[in-house]
Amino acid sequence: MPVYQLIPEIPLFPPIEEAEDDGLLAVGGDLTKERLLGAYRRGIFPWYEVGQPILWWSPDPRLVLFPDELKISRSLRKVLRKEQFEIRFDTAFQEVIKSCADVRTKQGKGTWIIPEMQQAYTELHQEGFAHSVESWLDGKLVGGLYGISMGQCFFGESMFSTMNDSSKVALVALADFSQRVGIKLIDCQMTTPHLLSLGAREIKREVFLKMLKNHLETPSIKGLWNNDPVSMKVNLLQN
């Protein structure tokens, strides 16, 4: 199948069914708020590296995590009970997204979180769509994740850790928060052994798109997410 070339400033996408076997749907376009939010509503996300045009993907199958299916290992439960990390929401979004990029670079891996992407998602954060979940230790950011929240869905983009289990604790906090505010689906996009071990599972793209349509009918939670350290501590210890 041909890969569609998108026209900048016209936020349209071809039918999802036109995607390549690897999930590649289109190239080009831009990273405006309208384009990005329109993409997520359709089950599409950008993923590309320096020197490449913007690449838009919709893989089949799709990796998702239902918040109540998160698997918490015995060792992670011990970490949660120690209350080692302080969890915060939306207090250091730019630092989280930059750390996600920097950690991958230091590990010798390529990163799609290039400066243009960081800027685009920071603007979405300022608009109340993009959020960060952060693990702090002694006043220092040591792990976290970020993504887009729309309707009853959270579209996870990336996570990082500079200490063992710090990103896992952030994911536990996200799953807990999701259940409390009515988020039904966490989109993990691409399949990885790490996410599978935490309870994520693959579903067919057509099933994902039906879920997406249903869950996006609910109004989005816009604005900064509430930070409540007392209730967060209680909920984490209940896992």
Where would I find each of the regions flagged by the language model?
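N-acyltransferase acceptor-side catalytic subdomain
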Residues: 1-239
